[in-house]
């Protein structure tokens, strides 16, 4: 079932509900930045088949929520957490108000949870590849590609076209110019948006120290972005009254010997899906 809901500033966000026959909880599935929701559908159906109604959606300017031209758009990276995720949490709460609400956040979808003023309405968070994106802690080959994208391709494309034409390069979905610039600036700092460099402009960070729900973080050792260093750099700033647990996968243990930053959601790594399901069940226990 397709859904539409509005952020506090009136921007319409779109998504879909993958309903469980007899739901025991609702899962808000937050995608990574500039990633089509269709990529997550097999995983969402897996959760629904095991009793979790899933709300899969996308951020302003991306996928089904790209409702206007990105040329000259004023969308910022922090809008994901400040404006869009709060609206998604509120919408998800209406689906089955009597049931627990969990979030599975991929990359920025978990990283920016603490920007949401209502994040403590969640009953649990599973963060998949949730870390900083610091260039300096990426493998050298990937680091060079990231620098090339953010420091060359992105500004040139923004100057020529008014937005970042990333989709034509088969990199990701197109990016609003301000979002790409802010994202790149964060990635240039080891502490990401926690850096004092952004103290006058960054969103309110207090919620990151007052989580009131359990957290499980899943990361693979071949993830080019969520490296061990980048993962620790983010989570050292985050506090919860409930446990924050980590599981580190060895890519060599996976059927195709690969996970990377996106492979967690590929059916070939269904072992990870089962671990997510087991953790959701423990949240519910």
Where are these regions (language model features)?
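Conserved alpha/beta-hydrolase
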Residues: 37-70
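Short beta-strand/loop motif that positions the catalytic acidic residue
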Residues: 211, 217-219, 223
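Active-site glycine-rich loops that stabilize anionic/oxyanionic intermediates
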Residues: 24, 31-35, 221
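N-terminal cap/lid segment of alpha/beta-hydrolase-fold proteins
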Residues: 1-19
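Alpha/beta-hydrolase-fold enzymes
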Residues: 104-191
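Alpha/beta-hydrolase active-site loop
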Residues: 74-95
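Catalytic active-site module of serine/aspartate enzymes centered on a nucleophile-bearing elbow/loop
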Residues: 245-285
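Short alpha-helix in the alpha/beta-hydrolase fold that links the catalytic acid
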Residues: 213, 227-237
């Amino acid at each position: 079932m397709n859904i539409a809901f509005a952020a506090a500033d009136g921007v319409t966000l779109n998504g879909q509900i993958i309903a469980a026959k007899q739901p025991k909880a609702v899962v808000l599935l937050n995608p990574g930045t500039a990633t089509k929701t269709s990529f997550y559908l097999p995983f969402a159906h897996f959760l629904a088949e095991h009793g979790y109604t899933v709300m899969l959606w996308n951020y302003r300017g991306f996928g089904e929520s790209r409702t206007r031209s990105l040329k000259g758009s004023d969308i910022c990276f922090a809008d994901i957490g400040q404006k869009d995720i709060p609206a998604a949490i509120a919408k998800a709460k209406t689906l089955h108000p009597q049931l627990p609400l969990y979030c599975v956040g991929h990359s920025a979808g978990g990283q920016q949870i603490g920007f949401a003023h209502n994040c403590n309405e969640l009953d649990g968070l599973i963060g998949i590849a949730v870390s900083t994106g610091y260039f300096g802690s990426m493998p050298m080959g990937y680091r060079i590609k990231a620098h090339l994208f953010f420091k060359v391709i992105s500004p040139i494309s923004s100057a020529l076209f008014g937005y970042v034409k990333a989709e034509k390069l088969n990199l990701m979905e197109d990016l609003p110019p301000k979002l790409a610039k802010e994202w790149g600036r964060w990635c240039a700092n080891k502490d990401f948006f926690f850096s004092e460099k952004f103290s006058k402009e960054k969103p309110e960070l207090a919620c990151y120290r007052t989580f009131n729900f359990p957290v499980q973080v899943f990361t693979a050792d071949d993830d080019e972005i969520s490296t061990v260093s980048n993962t620790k750099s983010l989570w050292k700033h985050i506090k919860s009254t409930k446990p924050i647990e980590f599981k580190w996968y060895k890519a060599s243990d996976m059927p195709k010997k690969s996970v990377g930053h996106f492979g967690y959601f590929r059916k070939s790594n269904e072992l990870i899906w089962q671990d997510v399901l087991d953790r959701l069940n423990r949240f519910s226990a």
